[in-house]
């Protein structure tokens, strides 16, 4: 699965160490988005959909950009 730089940065910010934990945190974050924050909602939805297609082993192999 290919993630772009923006997606990887979002994942890095909310990463709990597990794929399902990250999905949960992204869903939780979406609850706090304002109606005009559509770009972040679209970005996070795309990341969640891609994460659903990964296995936990594939997620563990992901490399996040350095801080």
Regions found by a protein language model. Name each.
Residues 1-25:
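N-terminal acidic leader/helix
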Residues 22, 26, 44-47:
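Generic structural signal of hydrophobic/aromatic residues within well-ordered alpha-helices
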Residues 65:
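Charged, terminal alpha-helix-loop-beta segments
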Residues 35-62:
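Short, charge-rich amphipathic interface segments used for partner binding and complex assembly
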């Amino acid at each position: 699965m290919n993630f772009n730089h923006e997606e990887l940065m979002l994942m890095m910010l909310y990463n709990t160490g597990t794929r399902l934990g990250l999905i949960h945190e992204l869903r939780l974050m979406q609850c706090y988005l304002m109606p005009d924050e559509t770009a972040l909602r679209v970005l996070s939805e795309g990341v969640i959909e891609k994460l659903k297609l990964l296995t936990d082993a594939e997620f563990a192999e992901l490399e996040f950009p350095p801080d």
